Amino acid sequence: MGSKTKGCCGWLIVALVASLVATAAVVAIMKKKVGGGSGRKLKPLPVPGPPGAIDSKYGDALGVALQFFQVQKAGKLENNQIPWRGDSALDDGKPAGLDLSKGMYDAGDHIKFSFPMAFTATVLSWSILEYGDQMSATKQLDPALDALRWITDFLVNAHPSDNVFYIQVGDPDLDHNCWERPETMSEKRPLTQINTKSPGSDVAAEAAAAMASASIVFKSRDTTYSDSLLQHAQKLFTFADTYKGLASDTYPKLQNYYNSTGYQDELLWAASWLYHATGDQTYLSYVTVENGKAFADWGRPTWFSWDDKLAGTQVLLSRLNFFGSKQTSNAENMGLKMYRDTAEAVICGLLPDSPSATASRTGGGLVWISGWNSLQHATNAAFLAVVYSDYMLTSQTAAVQCSGKYYSPTDIRNFAISQANYILGDNPMKLSYLVGYGSSYPQQVHHRGASIPADAKTGCKGFQYLHSTSPNPNVAMGALVGGPFQNDTFVDSRDNAVQTESSTYNSGTLVGLLSGLVTTSSVAQSFT
C-alpha cells in the first residue's frame, strides 16, 4: 500500500488534441451512430449475441482471481473456502455502537480503508453489470456477487446518519508495527469518521458511487437491499457535494497511505453512477454542464486508479453517447460528446502502434506508470479498453480515429488481451503475477495472513515470518501482486512490498478485464 498522485499525462493531452483536430477535418465522412459519436463506419459489423465459446484461459484465471476477495474478508466468515482464514475483527465498530465487522482488508495488512474498499465495490459492480453473463457462463457470478455484498454491507453500516461516514477502522501506524494473522490481532482498532465539520468529499462520493452502482446490480435480485443502497448513495452524494474537502486534509496521517489528490473526480463519478441508477436528469446535468466544465478536465485526462476516476467516468459516460440517453438537452449532449472524445483519446494512447501511443511501457509491452503497484494502471487501462471495444461492437461503430489512423474494436481488444496475457505469464520473467494461476507465480507475497502458519502463536511480533526467505505457508489465491519494474524484472521477496504486495482494488478491475475476455459478446445498452 503506498501513496500516488493523479498527475496529468502529457501523452494524453497530445492524443486528445490530435484526435479532436483530426475529427474536425474528416467530419464530412463520419457517419453518426446511435446517440451520436465519431466512429467511422467502414463496413457493417455483426453485433455479437450472448456469450459463445468460453476461452478457458481467461475463465480459469477469473475463477482464481475472485478467490482473493475470500482471502481478504473480515468479520464472521460464511461458507469460508480458504482453509487458513477464520473469523476476525468481530468487534470492529463497537465503540460507536456499530457493526463494522465485515468489509475487506485493503492489502497485506489489516486496516479497513473505506476509500479503496468502495472503489473496489464500484468497479466490481461495473464488471458485473457489463459482464454478468460471462461470469455466469463460467460459474463465477455468485462469487462476484458475494464479494460485492460483503463490501456494501460494511459501507451501509459505516453510514449511520446522513452526514456521518466512517472512513477507516484501525490505526495504520500501529498495524504496521505488527506482523500477525488477522484472526489473532488484539491491538486497539480506533474508528475515523467524516462529518460536516471534518469533511471528506472524496471518500463519501466514492462510497456513493459504490452503493449506486451496486444498487443496480441487486435491483433484480433483492429489491429491498437495492433500495437501501440507493438511498445511502443519494445521501452520501449530497453530503460530499455540500461539505467539500479532502479526507486526507482533514486527517493528514492518511497522506501516508491513501493520499487522494482531489475530490472533483469522485463527485463526477458518483453522479454518473447515480444517473445510471435513477435516470434522474439532475445527475446528468451535474456531470455534463456546469460541474463537467469545472471538474472534468476535458483535454487533460489521466490514468484510472483508486485515486483518479476521470478516465473511468469518461468511458462510463461514453456509453450514453454510444447508445443514446433519453431527453437530453443540447448542453448535456455536448458534455457527453466531450467525455467520449476524451475517452477515445485515452484509448488511442493505449494502442501500441497508434500515432499518439504512450511511450510509458516496458520492453515486454506492459503499460507502466509507477514503480509501486505497477500492475494497477495496466489492469485498469486494459479493463477500460475491453469495455470501450464492446461498446463499439454493440453500437456497430467500426473504428476509432487516432491522428488519422483507424482502429477497430478488435485492435482495442487486442491491447487488453496483451495486458492480460502479460499478467498471466506472457512476459520476460515467464511468471504469472496472479497467485495460484499457472505453474510459476510469486511465492513470497507480502501478506501477513499468508506468510504465517495458521497454528503459529506470534502475538504482534511475528516479523520472523516477514523476513523469512521461505515460500508462504499459505497461498493467497487470486492475489494480483504489485508487478514488475520498468525493465520487466521482479524480485520475489516478502520484504519487497513495492512488487509483492497485493490489493483488493487491483482485483476489482482484474475481474472485469478477465470477464470481458472470457468471450466476445454484446453489452446491454442500458443497465436498468
UniProtKB/Swiss-Prot annotation:
It is an enzyme of class 3 (hydrolase). The keyword tRNA processing does not apply. It is found in: Secreted. GO terms for molecular function: cellulase activity. Its main location: secreted. GO terms for cellular component: extracellular region. Its EC number is 3.2.1.4. Keywords: Carbohydrate metabolism, Cell wall biogenesis/degradation, Cellulose degradation, Glycoprotein, Glycosidase, Hydrolase, Polysaccharide degradation, Secreted, Signal. GO terms for biological process: cell wall organization; cellulose catabolic process. Residues 1-24 form the signal peptide. The keyword DNA repair does not apply. It catalyses: Endohydrolysis of (1->4)-beta-D-glucosidic linkages in cellulose, lichenin and cereal beta-D-glucans. Glycans are attached at N259, N487. InterPro entries: 6-hairpin_glycosidase_sf, 6hp_glycosidase-like_sf, Glyco_hydro_9, Glyco_hydro_9_His_AS. It comes from the Eukaryota. The active site is at D109, H446, D492, E501. Belongs to the glycosyl hydrolase 9 (cellulase E) family. This is Endoglucanase 24.
